[in-house]
Curated annotation (Swiss-Prot):
Disulfide bonds: none annotated. InterPro entries: DUF4005, IQ_motif_EF-hand-BS. Its main location: nucleus. The lineage of its organism: Eukaryota, Viridiplantae, Streptophyta, Embryophyta, Tracheophyta. The keyword rRNA-binding does not apply. The gene is IQD12. It comes from Arabidopsis thaliana. This is Protein IQ-DOMAIN 12. A motif (Nuclear localization signal 2) lies at residues 226-233. A motif (Nuclear localization signal 1) lies at residues 11-18. May be involved in cooperative interactions with calmodulins or calmodulin-like proteins. Recruits calmodulin proteins to microtubules, thus being a potential scaffold in cellular signaling and trafficking. May associate with nucleic acids and regulate gene expression at the transcriptional or post-transcriptional level.
Length: 404
């Protein structure tokens, strides 16, 4: 059976238990503090140990790497030494073999040099022979050409005419070349003068001309140069067409020994004045435009009253232009201003004239010229015949007017 406990016992127990509990709690706290203090140095020691281990592993790795690098360098050095030794051995062997090869090729090289020198000498000889052959061919061909030319000159019947033709062509070429050069010089001078005039117009100029007047003068000069060039081209074409006839006429005139140039020019001027007084207005040979207009008015006035049938004006204009071109051509070229008659000129005048005009003018003129020869000049016979015809026409016109 259990013993009964009093309240006093219970109180003791409580107090005693609390005291025990407090006594027990104090060492537990102390233990916990001591444990913490113990754990801290343990943790520090663990960290130090881990650090030392890592450093040791790193040192080991570095050492291993250094050892590997050293071994690799040693291996490379060994390989390089082996290669160098192999090259030395090879060079030594090549030197030995090259010495043997040079000793073997020395006579071959000497033979090649001898062959090249011999071939060069042969090539030089061949070139000299070819040059000599070319010279011989040139000499032979030149002699053959000279023989042909001499044979042609001997066989030609008109040797003098051919030489005169050649001389005339050369002189004409020189003349035309001079004219072209002169035209170029004139153009250059005109351009230079225009530039100078422009410069002067910008500044002070003592002349009374204005800028417009200077430009107008320059334009007129250029137009004159262009017209001159055209006329020269036209005369050249006409001369090329009529050159054989003119050359024959000039040679014939030289052989016949006609009068001087001044007398012929004076005779031409006199005959032209006399022709203008009695020829038909459609066949007038007047070079000026004023006389042509007056004659055309007379033609239009007389055509209604006169009984004669005049030809068309187209023929007169064509004939007049041709004769003007011929007169200008004779003046522009280096020929003498005389008029020599040929069959071609006679046929031309007949083709251009009408049947009524063919009867008494040109045929009688040419016949008289053939009969007289050197004694009577062409212009004198022409003037005499034309004066007779003019008198006859005037008398017929007066009789017709009286009858009307």
């Amino acid at each position: 059976m259990a013993k009964r406990r009093s309240w006093f016992g219970w109180m003791k127990r409580l107090f005693i238990c609390e005291a025990k509990a407090r006594a027990e709690k104090k060492p537990r706290r102390l233990r916990w503090v001591f444990k913490r203090l113990k754990l801290r140095p343990q943790l520090a020691t663990c960290g130090q140990e881990t650090r030392t281990l890592n450093e040791a592993t790193q040192d080991q790795r570095k050492h291993a790497m250094n050892v590997a690098i050293a071994t690799a360098a040693a291996a490379e050095a060994a390989v390089a030494a082996a290669k160098a030794a192999a090259e030395v051995v090879r060079m030594a062997g090549n030197a030995f073999t090259s010495q043997h090869f040079v000793k073997k090729l020395a006579p071959n090289v000497a033979a090649i040099k001898i062959q090249s020198a011999f071939r060069a000498s042969l090539a030089r000889k061949a070139l000299r022979a070819l040059k000599a052959l070319v010279r011989l061919q040139a000499i032979v061909r030149g002699r053959a050409v000279r023989r042909k030319v001499s044979a042609l000159l001997k066989s030609s019947h008109s040797n003098k005419a051919s030489t005169s033709n050649i001389i005339q062509r050369q002189t004409e070429r020189k003349h035309w070349s001079n004219t072209k050069s002169e035209i170029k010089e004139e153009l250059q001078v005109s351009n230079h003068s225009l530039c100078n005039s422009k410069v002067k117009c910008n500044g002070w100029d003592s002349s009374a001309l204005t800028k417009e007047d200077i430009k107008a003068i320059w334009l007129r000069k250029q137009e004159g140069v262009i017209k001159r060039d055209r006329m020269l081209k036209y005369s050249r074409s006409q001369r090329e067409r009529r050159s054989p006839h003119m050359l024959v006429e000039s040679l014939y005139a030289k052989d016949m020994g006609m009068r001087s140039c001044r007398l012929e020019h004076w005779g031409e001027s006199k005959s032209a004045k006399s022709i203008n007084s009695f020829l038909i207005p459609s066949e007038m040979l007047v070079p000026t435009k004023v006389k042509l207009r007056s004659l055309q008015r007379q033609d239009s006035g007389d055509g209604q009253d006169s009984p004669f049938s005049f030809p068309r004006r187209s023929f007169s204009r064509l004939e007049q232009s041709i004769l003007e071109d011929e007169s200008w051509f004779q003046r522009s070229n280096g020929f003498q201003p005389y008029m020599s008659v040929t069959e071609s000129a006679r046929e031309k005048m007949r083709s251009l004239s009408t049947p009524r005009q063919r009867v008494g003018i040109m045929d009688s003129l040419f016949d008289n010229y053939k009969k007289d020869g050197d004694k009577v000049s062409l212009w004198s016979t022409f003037v005499c015949e034309n004066s007779k015809i003019n008198n006859a026409k005037k008398s017929s016109l007066t009789t017709y007017q009286h009858n009307c």
